[in-house]
């Protein structure tokens, strides 16, 4: 009886391996790098000066401010 259960278990594992089970690893919360790419940073702001690495005008939505 136990050998039949063992054969059934091995057969099931061969037909349906655990790697075939879909994991939730593709959820956005598990991929912080992609979330950071979607973030709008000050460097993309139209008033950002890349030479001085600060914002020239209207520093309300852009940091750091050149002053």
Swiss-Prot record:
Disulphide bonds in the chain: 54-66, 55-62, 59-65
Ranges that cross the membrane: none
Residues found modified as Cysteine amide: 66
Keyword Acetylation: no
Tissue: Expressed by the venom duct.
Gene Ontology cellular-component annotations: extracellular region
Propeptide: 21-53
Chief location category: secreted
GO-annotated molecular function: ion channel inhibitor activity; toxin activity
Cellular compartment(s): Secreted
Signal peptide: 1-20
Coiled coil: none
Modified residues (4-hydroxyproline): 64
Protein keywords: Amidation, Cleavage on pair of basic residues, Disulfide bond, Hydroxylation, Secreted, Signal, Toxin
Domain notes: The cysteine framework is III (CC-C-C-CC). Classified in the M-2 branch, since 2 residues stand between the fourth and the fifth cysteine residues.
Family: Belongs to the conotoxin M superfamily.
Descriptive protein name: Conotoxin TxMMSK-01
Organism: Conus textile
Lineage: Eukaryota, Metazoa, Spiralia, Lophotrochozoa, Mollusca
């Amino acid at each position: 009886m136990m050998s039949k259960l063992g054969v059934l278990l091995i057969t099931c594992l061969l037909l349906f391996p655990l790697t075939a089970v879909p994991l939730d690893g593709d959820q956005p919360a598990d991929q912080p790098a992609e979330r950071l790419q979607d973030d709008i940073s000050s460097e993309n702001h139209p008033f950002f000066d890349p030479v001085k690495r600060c914002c020239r005008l209207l520093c309300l939505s852009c940091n750091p401010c050149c002053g």
